[in-house]
UniProtKB/Swiss-Prot annotation:
Growth enhancer. InterPro entries: Bact_OuterMem_StrucFunc, Msp4_OMP-like, OMP/PagP_b-brl, OmpA-like, OmpA-like_sf. It comes from the Bacteria. Disulfide bonds: none annotated. This is Outer membrane protein.
């Protein structure tokens, strides 16, 4: 019942609803945890002959444990793809409260502990690949290492007055399976709360424990004790910190809808060489400018005439002629604006002759883009 209850508690914590992005570790991290340790009944073989290492033909009993506690610390490295490697040191403790069967009824008391190290390989499961965007990362892992089992002087007092004591320290190969989940603590990048279940197994002990029997308070014999597999079921809460975790990205900037394009406020009307009359295309452009003046806030319309620097008589005479030509072009555009409904008083005209060319040229050069009138809405 205790095992089922602890498993349910771990599952519920891992499934708690949350909302944010989960952390996949890249780089170094540290991990600490502690919790509940439940040791399965452990089978021991005993011999009263200290020289006889074969236990299979001698007596045997099972030792039963009360619930204890466990703790671990680990340092590791995450590869950014869910895979992690870590080195771990761990400690387990439990009380021994029963031994059976025995030759006579009795009461057993004592405790044992195990400690050592593991190398673990773990994998973090990114839930986003399944369309689940929460700050929880489930993980699974396996580990292997070496554990020492220390049995304190564990005493069995029989109803007939005899006493047996078991004690010693021996080590052996150990392994573990891990399943759990990590929750990203809000506003603390890299820090996670972890909940996990571990099954820690120890296949054998590399040497015997000491078994001493007493009768009427006097040591009667000293022998060996060997233990079979040892299994720990552990339910652990902990904290993990990843050092290279960047803070979460800022929320996306609100989408700014660009304003609707405003009508052009400058219009260009082009002329043939040495001409001031409007072409059909020029009349269309003037009409667009006249219509735009009614849709935007306009206080006045400036009409500026220009020429290129070509002339039949280059020099001052040509410059004077071009100045007059630029004014006539501006007057032609003004007259067309008035026909299109623009009030006369809103129009100012200027002639600049060869000044302010759109396209710089050499002297006495015919350039179509410089033969123009600019309509500017103010």
């Amino acid at each position: 019942m205790r095992l089922r209850t602890a498993l349910l508690a771990t599952t519920l914590m891992a499934a708690a609803p949350v909302a944010a992005n989960a952390t996949i570790i890249t780089g170094p991290y540290v991990d600490l945890g502690g919790g509940y340790n439940l040791v399965q009944n452990q089978h021991g073989h005993f011999s009263n002959d200290p020289a006889n290492a074969s236990m299979l033909t001698k007596s045997s009993s099972q030792y039963r444990h009360d619930a204890g506690f466990t703790g671990f610390g680990a340092v590791g490295w995450g590869f950014g793809n869910g895979l992690r490697l870590e080195a771990e040191g761990l400690y387990n403790y439990s009380e021994i409260n029963h031994r059976a069967p025995t030759a006579a009824t009795g009461v057993t008391s004592g405790h044992d502990q195990s400690y050592g190290g593991m190398l673990n390989v773990l994998y973090d499961i990114d839930l986003k690949q399944f369309g689940i965007d929460v700050p929880v990362t489930p993980f699974v892992g396996v580990g292997a290492g070496y554990l020492w089992q220390n049995v304190s002087p564990t005493t069995t007092r029989y109803s007939n007055g005899n006493v047996s004591r078991l004690g010693g320290t021996n080590g052996g190969f150990a392994y573990q399976g891990i399943v759990g989940a990590a929750y990203d603590i809000p506003n603390m990048p890299g820090l996670q709360l972890t909940a996990q279940y571990r099954m820690v197994g120890q296949a054998f002990s590399d040497g015997p424990f000491t078994m001493t029997s007493y009768t009427n308070g006097v040591g009667k014999s000293v022998g060996h004790a060997f233990f079979d597999n040892r299994f720990n079921h552990q339910f652990i809460l902990g904290l993990r910190y990843a050092f290279n975790t960047a803070p979460p990205p800022p929320p996306p900037a609100p989408v700014v809808v660009p304003p609707a394009p405003t009508p052009a406020r400058t219009y260009l009307v082009f002329f043939d060489w040495d001409r001031s009359d409007l072409t059909a295309r020029a009349r269309e452009i003037v009409a667009e400018a006249a219509q735009a003046s009614t849709h935007v806030q306009t206080t006045r319309i400036e009409v500026n005439g220009y020429t290129d620097n070509s002339a039949a008589h280059p020099g001052p005479r040509g410059e004077k002629y071009n100045m007059g030509l630029s004014i006539r072009r501006a007057q032609s555009v003004k007259a067309e604006l008035i026909r299109d409904g623009v009030p006369t008083g809103a129009i100012d005209i200027h002639g600049y002759g060869e000044q302010h060319p759109l396209v710089p040229t050499g002297p006495n050069t015919r350039e179509p883009q410089n033969r123009r009138v600019e309509i500017i809405l103010h």
